[in-house]
């Protein structure tokens, strides 16, 4: 089980690196799906099945829509592939940053955080992840509204930036 969790953590980091160093939106989707599956599998191994399922639905439902939209706007006839030197350089530099962060974190010893599973507090009638979701929606209403307005503003800003001189892949007829 330990090796499975370590493998899921490695896949999560590699998926994040693939999203960060993607040469085109076509390949960014692969990294996003890898990171999403690995992160939700990691949460599932800790016993947080409901939150893992909700996050999986949100990531693959919402973020793939964004990637499909960006793919339709970036109609490259010859997209950059993973083997290009610029993409390999980005990936190598991101891996070096992650390794340096692990070394510095190990030297400072700030990683003294224990992993607690959902059922570790004893016997409860309601699992902790379900009660956490209820608190998430009851006490977090203001933050949800602020995050929703922020995402709406971000959508309009991105649409305005991408529009440019209306000479993109999608043109008004």
Curated annotation (Swiss-Prot):
Membrane topology: Multi-pass membrane protein
Disulfide bonds: none
Catalytic activity: a ubiquinone + NADH + 5 H(+)(in) = a ubiquinol + NAD(+) + 4 H(+)(out)
GO cellular component, one term: mitochondrial membrane
Enzyme Commission number(s): 7.1.1.2
Membrane spanning residue stretches: 1-21, 27-47, 48-68, 88-108, 139-159
Keyword annotations from UniProtKB, A to Z: Electron transport, Membrane, Mitochondrion, NAD, Respiratory chain, Translocase, Transmembrane, Transmembrane helix, Transport, Ubiquinone
InterPro entries registered for this protein in UniProt: ComplexI_Subunit6, NADH_UbQ/plastoQ_OxRdtase_su6, Nuo/plastoQ_OxRdtase_6_NuoJ
Compartments reported by the entry: Mitochondrion membrane
Gene3D superfamilies given in the database record: NADH-ubiquinone/plastoquinone oxidoreductase chain 6, subunit NuoJ (1.20.120.1200)
GO molecular function, one term: NADH dehydrogenase (ubiquinone) activity
Function: Core subunit of the mitochondrial membrane respiratory chain NADH dehydrogenase (Complex I) that is believed to belong to the minimal assembly required for catalysis. Complex I functions in the transfer of electrons from NADH to the respiratory chain. The immediate electron acceptor for the enzyme is believed to be ubiquinone.
Family: Belongs to the complex I subunit 6 family.
Protein name as annotated: NADH-ubiquinone oxidoreductase chain 6
Taxonomic path: Eukaryota, Metazoa, Chordata, Craniata, Vertebrata
Gene for this chain: MT-ND6
């Amino acid at each position: 089980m330990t090796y499975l969790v370590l493998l899921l953590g490695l896949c999560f980091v590699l998926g994040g690196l693939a999203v960060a160093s993607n040469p085109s939106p076509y390949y960014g989707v692969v990294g996003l799906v890898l990171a999403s599956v690995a992160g939700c599998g990691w949460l599932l191994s800790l016993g947080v099945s409901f939150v893992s399922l909700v996050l999986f639905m949100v990531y693959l439902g919402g973020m793939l829509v964004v990637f499909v939209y960006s793919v339709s706007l970036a109609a490259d006839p010859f997209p950059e592939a993973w083997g290009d030197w610029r993409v390999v350089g980005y990936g190598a530099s991101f891996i070096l940053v992650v390794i340096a962060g692990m070394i510095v974190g190990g030297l400072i010893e700030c990683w003294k955080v224990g992993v607690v599973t959902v059922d570790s507090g004893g016997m409860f009638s309601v699992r902790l992840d379900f009660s956490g979701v209820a608190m998430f929606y009851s006490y977090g209403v203001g933050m949800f509204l602020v995050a929703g307005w922020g995402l709406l503003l971000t959508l309009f800003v991105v649409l305005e930036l991408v529009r440019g001189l209306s000479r993109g892949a999608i043109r008004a007829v």
